[in-house]
Structures are given as structure tokens and as C-alpha cells.
Amino acid sequence: MTATPADRPDPGVAGDADWAAEARPLLVHADMRLCKRFDQGEPTERLLALRARAVDQLMRNAWTRCIPADAGLSLHAVGGYGRGELFPRSDVDLLVLGETAAQQRHEQALARLFALLWDVGLPISHAVRSPAQCTSAAADQTVLTALIESRPLVADAQARAALAAAIAPQQVWPPRAFFQAKREELHARHQRFGDTADNLEPDIKDGPGGLRDLQTLGWMALRAFGVKDLEALVGLGHVGMDEAAALRREREELARLRYGLHLVANRPEERLRFDYQKTLAERLGFADDPESLGVEKMMQRFYRSAALIRRISDRLLQRFEEQFDGEAVPVQLDAGFSLRRGYLTADADTWPDGDVVQVFALFAQWAAHREVRGLHSLTARALAEVLRDLPAYDVADAIARDRFMALLRGPRAVETLNRMARLGVLGQWIPAFASVSGRMQFDLFHVYTVDQHTLMVLRNIALFAAGRADERFSITHEVWPRLRKPELLLLAGLFHDIAKGRGGDHSELGAVDARAFCLAHRLSEGDTELVTWLVEQHLRMSVTAQKQDISDPEVIHRFATLVGTRERLDYLYLLTCADIAGTSPKLWNAWKDRLLADLYFAARRALREGLEHPPPREERLREARESARTLMQAQGHDDATIDRQFAGMPDENFLRFRPEQLAWQAASLIEVQIGQTLVKARRAVPDNDALEVFVYSPDRDGLFSAIVATLDRKGYGIHRARVLDAPHDAIFDVFEVLPQDSSADGDPQRLAAALRQVLAGDLLKVRPSRRAVPRQLRHFRFAPRVEFSESAGGRRTRISLVAPDRPGLLADVAHVLRMQHLRVHDARIATFGERAEDQFQITDEHDRPLPDAARQALRDALCACLDPT
């Protein structure tokens, strides 16, 4: 493929611009032809080689133009270009080899060469070294890695031999040391990505299971065995034909993704960012259907490729290690299994002989011996070879099912499930789990694939089982010991999202799967019903806590009635905590912990006292006052002071807050006179970033809007706001906030001072700040929805708002409400990835619910403010 102008006598530097102008469109046209062939489905491996060949020709012509034939210099391709692989926007790595004197003598000619190549449009990266300098530079194994894949472009046999000698194992990095360095580098790189490829925006090149892992294996093979590709290791007995074929297939899959990503992004982009995912999926032919988006199919294929590469890579790394260290004397374990250099090995050559019971016996041994480093490569390969022949649970015999349940009831059950999932055994035993393996959801709420999220949920359950207090989960360690059969919670966690992507309600469909599994594994009817109910209702506690007013006895009564028993409540609470915390590292926070704990205790009390006769309002008020009074008395306050402060607090306050919050509010009010403004802030939970802000103030137009705008400007996100009318025309505002960005310093005193300063001024001049929408959020835009309903027995209007999340959203909503002369009485703020789902209870300025005309005017104003288009 010609990509350069014809060779011609060198007219000197003056003609370089004309040469580059002629070469540039030829290179562009070559890329366009390759792009067309890519879209037609030609193998990516061939396209990479053709592009490298086109650039080779340009390089040779440019070299001939700029460098004299007798210069004593040679030109070599290194790195990926040296492998003969050149992606559309990748750097072109070059080495100019020559002795120092030759380098100095032709310094200007080399500068001219590099300038000419840049002028053509090639993103070159170059080094100019002597053989001795190559040896010195190769002390850095990353430099050696680039050099060992060198390919001569303009070099005679002597130059090629000099470079080979300079970086020979006898000179630098013998095979064993190189292997160890590369293995450590691989592990460190994996850790940078959280040791998983299942991120929302994975890195195709450097992420776990990515192209870099395959290249690392190739570098090790080249240094240790002198072979250019992994397929050559088949004949040496280090790689099976099936493994080599699988790696080649997955390499083509990832290379095609990367090639397309470079074209779509028009830059050397290695991460599958949201900016490009949909466009790339369309280009690669992934179409939407009723069950899955095309982009979700593309990402699932990537995640599965990465998982398979990691499985095979683990086996190869272990074999390379054995090549250097030799076979170890086995340490016998129970019958049929032993340890070799810490790796668990099945002793029989015929293991597992298609017997899933033997496979489960392997995992039982793994769980029983903490010293096991992993699975021996021979055993892992034997397992992989028979994996597809192992029966699923619904056709396996009763012995196999009993063995699986024994693993769930045995030690380190969650670790066992993780291992089974990674090795493909769990998906083979439960085919529905295989269906969600690698399945992503194209949103910002679910940051893991469904299978990885499920495993995260199980890990959280294991954390609860440890029985230690954890600052993230305030009461899980207290609830866990009450579980009659912990394995039932594991089953609920395993099945709660297993029906994702089938269409329909995944909770209901998953419950059907869970019931079938439990019955097949001979669980009792009661245990089966509990697991089935947990899967079907696994979202109920989260939705109730985050979207309903759990200080309302009717809400608690409905929830407790649904739950029915203390046992169900215990299991559901733990499953809900594990589920939310396993959805995203940022989703779980102190407020959610406290919210769920409050709902748990309220429901537990309702169940204890009986659902037929919930306590009347007056009794609840009396109990709240007495509990708060006891706390204040312990702080040294006398009854007269307590009575005076309680008289200044609205009755509704005693129904909405816990006794310790009431005591804090009442004690704070001692400092203020009627008509004055009080602002207090404190840490809601010790050693946590969550803050509670209490504002007592004369009612003023724009008060709520000014507070919200100030909190937003100071970098705090509001999770809950409660606004109550107090005696003497005062307002009780309580906000639960968390630092949202780096501008929030987390100091409650400074935040309170900032609010006091704002509230001392003209509230009507306070405006929401303007901030840019983060990159990720820009790709999930949709029209806002505003719905109205009655609340508080018809005395108020409830707004349910669903809109694309963005910085300052709540401040903008509060500003719209102020401009419409509306009063906010309650606000519940919930964010689910890119979606904000907020609820407000409002009235007009005369404390009346909104009529239809006012509702429509408010809807129009909110949509105009929040519509991303």
C-alpha cells in the first residue's frame, strides 16, 4: 500500500514542505481506505499490519531524504509499531541507533527528519541512542520492553546485531528478573483499576483483562523463550491449543474495539467513555432490542472478553513461574488434593472426569485451607476444559445439590462464590447467573456489571458476618446474630438481580428463579418462602426510606404490614444495606445508614406493639417529649427551661426527629430570643462528613431558597430538608447535608457562620450559582417530569420531580419555587446516578394547596429551568 510520494532526488530542506504536502493526503487516504475496510468487517489484525506497512514506507522515504547513506545510523520501529501493530491514532515509536559521534555529526539531519515526520501528521515518539546507551536505558524495564519488540526499518545486519547484543539477557534483565518485574507491574496496574475491568468506563488497553495483559504475556514469552507470539508456546508445552485460540480470539475482539474507539474519538483514546460508547456500538453493529441496548451488548462482550483473558493469563503466569522455579514437592491435603508451591492441585490426571461433585470438593478444600494461593494452572485448565459439560443445578443429582448447599453453609462461603464466579463454575451451575455476567446498565447509578454488583453485595454480607462494628454500617453487626440461617441471605443476595435484562419486573422474575432453585436444593417451604420474598421485595425498604416520609406513622404501618415478621425485617434490612453499598462506592453514606436504621427500628417497634392498634398521635408526642426531656436533664437543664423551649417548638417536630435531635434543637434555642435568627451545624455522626444544619428564623420571603443556594455554593449536597412552622411566625429548617465537592471543607462552625452572614442580608438578592455539568452527566439527558398530588390530608401539594442531575439542581428548583411565591414544608432529595428524584411538600403564600392553574404554571417554570435541551 503506497502512502508516500515517489522517491526522488533530494532537493534539500527547501523542498521538505512540498514533500510533506504531497505525503500528507496520501497517508490520510490510506487511513480512509483502512477505515472503510474496518467498517466492512475485515480482521483488525490485518488492518493494523497494513497501517504499519504504509507508515514503514513513508519512514524509509523520509529517512532516505534526510539521512545520508553513510551516516552510520539506523532506524528501528519499537513498541507497538515494532510489533507491526499501528492503531489509527497511536504514537509511532522510533529508535535511531548509532554511535555518539554519528549522532552528533548528523544532529541537524535528525532534527530535520523528525520535523518532516511531524509535518506529515505522524505523532512520532523517538529516541536516539548508541548500543551502549540502549543497554543503560534498558535498566528501566519499560524501556527494555519497547526495545525487545524492535523491528528494523532502515538497518543493515550489523546494526540489527548491535541492538540485539545491547539488550541481550546477558547484558540486562535476565528472563527470571524480567518476569518478576513484569508480573509486579501487571498486579500494580490492576490495582490502579480496582482489580476489575467491570467499570463504567473501562480502559481497553491498560485495564485488567485488556490488551496490555496480552502484551505482557507476549513480552514474557519473548524474553524467556525467544518466541514472537503466544501460539509458538503451544509446541513448547506452555500453552494449550485451546488457550492460544481463545487468547487470539479475544485479542481480535479487543483490538477491534480499540481500533473503532480511535476512529470514533479521533484521538488516542483508550477508555470506553460514555462520550463514545453509543456511537462505537452503532459503528460495530450492535443494535438495540426490547431487552438490551446495543451499547449494553457491546459492553457485555468486552467484559466477558476481559474476564476470559484474566482467567487464562492467571494460568500462564503460574506456568511461567514454574518454568523458572521448577516443580515443587506436593503437600498432601485430603484425599485427591494437594498443594504445589501453595497452589491447590487435583491429584488425579482424569479429574474431575465430568463430575460436578468433584468440582465442589475442590472448592471445599480451597475454603478449608487459608494458605492456598490459588488454583494450580493444570487443575484450572482441566476445569476450563470440562466446564461446559458440567450440569446445571436443575439437571444435576441430589448429591451435587447438597454439596453446593454445603459450600454455602460452610466457612468462607462468599469467597467460594467469588472464586466459582471468576472461574465460570457459578454461571454453569446457575445459567441465569451466566446470563447477567458482564451485563452492564447504561447509566451512572449502577457502576458495576450485574454479576460484579452481586458479588459486591455478597462481600458486604460477609462483612456483616464478621460481627465487628463498622463505621459505614451502624447496626448491621447487631442484627446479623439474629439470622437463623445466614445462607438464606446469601441466596437472596445471589438472586436479587439475576433477572436483569429479561424485560419485565426483575424482582418478580428473580423471585421465580429463586423459588425454583430453593425447591431443587430441598430447602424447607418456610426457607424457600423467605428467600423468594426477599428477592421479590428487595427494593421495598430502600424505596420506602428514600422516597417516603418515615416519620409518618401511616408509612411505617404500611411497611411493617408488608414485612409482617421480625425475621423478614432482619433479613431485608441486611440485604438492603448490602445492596445499596454494593451498587456504587459513592452511593452509601451516613445519611442512608441512619435512614435505614430509623426505618428498621420504627418497623421493629410497630411489629412488637402490634399492627392492629398503632399508637395514637398524642401518645407518640408524649413519648418523644419525655425521651428528649430525659436527655436534656442529663445535660443539666431544669424542667422550667425545658418546658419553655419545648413550647417554642412545633408539635410536628416531635414526630419527625429522634430524641437526641430534639434535645440538641431545644438546647440551641436557649441562645435565641423571639424574632432573632439562629443557625447551628454539627456532625450528624461522629467521625463522619455528614452534617446537620438547624435554622430557626422569622419567616421571610426567600429564606428556603437562600439557604439552599448557600449550601450549594459552599459545596454541600442536601439529602433531606424539613421546614416546619413554629410559634411566633418562626420557621424551623433542618437540613441533612454531605460535602459534594472539594469546596466543602466539612467544618460545621464555618458553614454555620457562612449561613448567618447570608441570612443577615437581603435574601432576595441571593441567586443560585452557575456551574458546568460534569462530562459524564452530559451523556444522560432526558426531559424532566413533574407530577402533583395531595399530601397531609389535602392541606398541601406534593411535587414529585424527576430530572437529569447536575450541580446546583436543588438551588435552581428552590429559586423557581420562590419566584412562584410558594412555601416549602418538606423536601426529600434522592439521586440515582444521572437521575435526581426529589419530592417537595408545598403550599402557596397563604398556606393553601395549589389549584390546577398554579400547578401548571409551576410545571412550566420547572421544566423551562431544568430541561437539558
Curated annotation (Swiss-Prot):
Regulation acting on activity, per entry: Uridylyltransferase (UTase) activity is inhibited by glutamine, while glutamine activates uridylyl-removing (UR) activity.
Pfam families cross-referenced by the UniProt entry: ACT, GlnD_UR_UTase, HD, NTP_transf_2
ACT domain residues: 692-771, 798-869
Keyword field: Hydrolase, Magnesium, Multifunctional enzyme, Nucleotidyltransferase, Repeat, Transferase
Family annotation (SUPFAM superfamilies): ACT-like, HD-domain/PDEase-like, Nucleotidyltransferase, Nucleotidyltransferase substrate binding subunit/domain
Region Uridylyl-removing, annotated ranges: 333-691
Domain HD, chain residue ranges per copy: 450-572
Gene3D superfamilies: 3.30.70.260, cca-adding enzyme, domain 2 (1.10.3090.10)
Keyword Protein biosynthesis included in the entry's annotation: no
Catalytic activity annotation: [protein-PII]-L-tyrosine + UTP = [protein-PII]-uridylyl-L-tyrosine + diphosphate; [protein-PII]-uridylyl-L-tyrosine + H2O = [protein-PII]-L-tyrosine + UMP + H(+)
Ranges for region Uridylyltransferase: 1-332
PROSITE patterns recorded: ACT, HD
MF terms (GO), sorted A to Z: [protein-PII] uridylyltransferase activity; phosphoric diester hydrolase activity
Cofactor or coenzyme needed: Mg(2+)
GO biological process, one term: regulation of nitrogen utilization
Purpose of the protein: Modifies, by uridylylation and deuridylylation, the PII regulatory proteins (GlnB and homologs), in response to the nitrogen status of the cell that GlnD senses through the glutamine level. Under low glutamine levels, catalyzes the conversion of the PII proteins and UTP to PII-UMP and PPi, while under higher glutamine levels, GlnD hydrolyzes PII-UMP to PII and UMP (deuridylylation). Thus, controls uridylylation state and activity of the PII proteins, and plays an important role in the regulation of nitrogen assimilation and metabolism.
Family named by the database record: Belongs to the GlnD family.
NCBIfam families referenced in this protein's UniProt entry, alphabetically: PRK04374.1, UTase_glnD
Domains: entry comment: Has four distinct domains: an N-terminal nucleotidyltransferase (NT) domain responsible for UTase activity, a central HD domain that encodes UR activity, and two C-terminal ACT domains that seem to have a role in glutamine sensing.
PANTHER family noted in UniProt: BIFUNCTIONAL URIDYLYLTRANSFERASE/URIDYLYL-REMOVING ENZYME (PTHR47320), BIFUNCTIONAL URIDYLYLTRANSFERASE_URIDYLYL-REMOVING ENZYME (PTHR47320:SF1)
Name of the protein: Bifunctional uridylyltransferase/uridylyl-removing enzyme
